[in-house]
Every structure is written in C-alpha cells, then in structure tokens.
Amino acid sequence: MRTLLIGYGNPGRGDDGLGPALAEAIEALGLPDLKVDIDFQLNVEDAWEMNGYDRAIFADAAVEGAEPFFFKEVVPEDSADFSSHSASPAGVLKLARNLFNAKVRGFVIGIRGYEFDVFGAPITPRAQDNLRQAIAFLAETLRVGEKEPAAPA
C-alpha cells in the first residue's frame, strides 16, 4: 500500500512541532512504499502530491482531544477551510479527489500537545511521551498495511 505521510507544524513553537517530529521518526525507519513530506502547514499543492497514493496520513499536534493521540479517517468536505496558503486535511483530500481523481484514503493522527505559545521552546516532556506512543502506533500501522490497529480509546 503506497502511503504519503505529511507531518506539519512549526518546530519552533514547542509542541506544535509534534507532526514534523513524528514524520522524521517514521521516515528514519526506511519503510517501503512510504513517502514523507514535512512542512509548516498544509497547502493546496498537497492535493497534487496525493495522486498515485493509496493512503495519506496527516500528522499534526492536537491542542485538545484524546491523549496520547487520536487516529481517524478524514471525510472529504466541500465546505472544508482552505486558502492559497493553508488548508485542512478534509479540504486537501477533497481537492485531490475532485481535481486529480485521486483514489486516496485520508487519515489524521493528532498528537496531544500542551505548550504552543513559546517560540524557540522544545517539545514538552508530556508531549514527547505522547509522541513516542504515536510513533510506535504509526510504525505498526504502516508495517501491517491494510490491517490498521485501533488507536487508543
């Protein structure tokens, strides 16, 4: 299963760097059929990038929600927010399907973070623990392909 992993966020803003950190760790595993992109935010160009992949996984920090992380399928939405400079996973997926006839399934992994306001701060210890668990989960998910394990409740 060809997979595109897009890790996004600002590593210079504490826990906002969780998405890129996860993407870097997964890329280092050297898994087959995996392409990793890292950026500060999603944009409309990511819709083109999804063409030819079976699955796209969007990795980002989560300001709220389940700890240590959540993993869910993205439903493409016509009303999803996006502009020429930033987009949501649902919006990018909808564009990929509408403009490029991409058959990709989309998923979001949101890693719970706690501190986003201090520029230059590293990822907090609590968020690092969440990140470790998210890396283990995603590595297993990518290794087993179609049989995606359930995320923690």
Name these PLM-found stretches.
Residues 15, 19, 85, 89, ...:
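Generic structural signal for well-ordered, non-membrane alpha-helical segments
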Residues 62-108:
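Helix-loop-strand module that forms the ligand-binding subsite of alpha/beta enzymes
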Residues 3-5, 13-69:
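Nucleotide and nucleotide-moiety/phosphate-recognizing core
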Residues 1, 32, 102-105:
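Residue-level signal for beta-strand positions within conserved beta-sheet cores that form or flank
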Residues 22-24, 73-76, 126-127:
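Glycine-rich, phosphate-binding/catalytic loops in enzymes
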Residues 93-153:
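Phosphate-binding/catalytic loops
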Residues 6-10, 112:
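Glycine-rich beta-strand-to-loop/alpha-helix junction loops that act as flexible
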